[in-house]
Amino acid sequence: AYDDRVTEFAAVAVEGGATVPVLHSLVNPGRPIPWRISELTGITDRMVYGAPPFARLAPLVREAMEARVFVAHNAAFDWSFVSAELTRAGEPVPEVAQLCTVKLARRVLPFLPRRSLDHVTAHYGVHITGRHRADGDAVATAEVLRRLLADAETLGAATWGELQALTTRGTGTARRTRRSLLPKSFDPDSFDSPA
């Protein structure tokens, strides 16, 4: 994502059960928008012509994220864009806790065939206004987050630590960690499991 550019930024906060707009702006990427991105988002070069470059928004973006949890549907992907833009703008990248609603949906909704934002919002009956636009996706993700958190609580994950444990359980990192605890001489093919 370091070579790619943001064309729109939106942040909302979930406060007291309400979704509160924090920041929203089109962003001038300083170069032509690839046609596939325009096709997906509807954002054109003409739309961003008078928009601020990310560098002008960077202090506001950083401020919007401080003392908050960065939540996104595929958080690692979105964070790679945000952190790259902040770095490019010379703005310090805040160390923020992150929560990925895709990972949370995998644990809370294991029966769904897919965990895309479209599938998860459909499951919860959440309507997305402006799909593939930053503000529409941010609001939809906030709505999904509220429902996922309620469902996670029924699974015993009510605290930040429990949510982190739930979303990382069984991931590649956890599997690698478990494997690293095994003796080097361990042969999984010779292991007899109890009947």
Roles of regions detected by a PLM:
Residues 1-98, 110-132:
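Conserved non-catalytic scaffold segment of RNase H-like nuclease domains
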